[in-house]
């Protein structure tokens, strides 16, 4: 059954402050990461680090996600707008975060933290990789609730009508449904069955399922047994790269523009290196010893 998206992106208001569901998804992501990370610390999955050390690591990773995600969005998807108005970087309430930018931010944060604590960077990445899909899943749910990053038009029975989406898949300059009808009119047309040809793939939910649920289950189960260095990180990079590349085929390209060949998106280009890196890390893991878990110390490094 085709569904009309009518979810208010604002969860609640505190006086003049409006709290968006997307922001709550970030809080849920970090809360889940802390709980799951606690289990892995107690199981000795990060040599020489206790909960105090992990809390420190999570804080810097959070900073990497937020700062890297915002800067990455400006560089990868809105560079022209950023050059015209650099202060856009700080207007985070208008939306705009990039996974690939957030990943770079986390890598920089982990590299700094690992050096500071005299740990091997990939041991830290292997420890943290199973925690990331939960955040990805919550983030994509936030995208869906906010009615953004929609998919292409579809005739499938599970399509979703997004009032903010363009009326066609023709790149750039298209009016959105809410630009030509108010929401009451949209509801009336929907009830009369007149909007079915505007239904779109709920690509946010596809990504929440693949990048969130599926990746979490696979990585969590894979990492429960001792693995060689690089193996868990390699599996994360490979799975994310493949899943993101595939979902991009049913997701509208950023700014409605394909980068090449009339079908290749910027998201696919940014995901290809992850696939290559994942395979390379797997190759390295085959040449590395299996790391045995060590109980967490009472005092962190």
UniProtKB/Swiss-Prot annotation:
Membrane spanning residue stretches: 10-30, 57-77, 92-112, 119-139, 202-222, 230-250, 264-284
Q: Give the binding site residues for a 1,2-diacyl-sn-glycero-3-phospho-(1'-sn-glycerol).
A: 140
Enzyme nomenclature, EC number: 2.5.1.145
- The enzyme class is transferase
GO molecular function list: phosphatidylglycerol-prolipoprotein diacylglyceryl transferase activity
> Which pathway?
Protein modification; lipoprotein biosynthesis (diacylglyceryl transfer)
Would you tell me the Gene Ontology cellular component terms? plasma membrane
Q: Which cysteines are joined by disulfide bonds?
A: none
Q: Which family does it belong to?
A: Belongs to the Lgt family.
What name goes with this protein?
Answer: Phosphatidylglycerol--prolipoprotein diacylglyceryl transferase
């Amino acid at each position: 059954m085709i569904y009309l998206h009518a979810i208010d992106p604002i969860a609640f208001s505190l006086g003049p402050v409006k709290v968006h569901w997307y922001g709550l998804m970030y809080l849920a992501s970090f809360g889940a990461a802390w709980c799951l990370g606690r289990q892995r610390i107690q199981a000795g999955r990060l040599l020489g680090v206790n909960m105090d050390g992990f809390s420190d690591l999570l804080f810097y990773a959070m900073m990497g996600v937020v700062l890297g995600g915002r800067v990455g969005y400006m560089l990868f998807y809105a560079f022209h707008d950023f050059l015209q108005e650099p202060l856009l970087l700080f207007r985070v309430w208008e939306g705009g975060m990039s996974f690939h930018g957030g990943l770079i931010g986390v890598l920089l944060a982990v590299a700094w933290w690992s050096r500071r604590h005299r740990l091997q960077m990939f041991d830290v990445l292997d420890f943290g990789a199973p925690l990331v899909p939960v955040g990805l899943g919550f983030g994509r749910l936030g995208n869906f609730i906010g009615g953004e990053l929609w998919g292409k038009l579809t005739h499938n029975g599970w399509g979703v009508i997004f009032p903010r989406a363009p009326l066609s898949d023709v790149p750039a300059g298209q009016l959105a449904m809410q630009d030509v009808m108010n929401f009451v009119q949209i509801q009336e047309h929907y009830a009369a069955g007149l909007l079915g040809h505007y239904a779109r793939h709920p690509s946010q939910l596809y990504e929440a399922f693949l990048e969130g649920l599926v990746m979490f289950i696979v990585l969590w189960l894979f990492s429960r047994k001792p693995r060689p260095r690089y193996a868990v990180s390699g599996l994360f990079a490979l799975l994310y790269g493949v899943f993101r590349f595939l979902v991009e085929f049913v997701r509208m390209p950023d700014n409605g523009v394909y980068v090449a060949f009339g079908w290749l998106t910027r998201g696919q280009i940014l995901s290809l290196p992850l696939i290559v890196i994942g395979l390379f890390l797997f190759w390295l893991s085959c040449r590395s010893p299996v790391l045995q878990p060590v109980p967490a110390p009472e005092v962190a490094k």
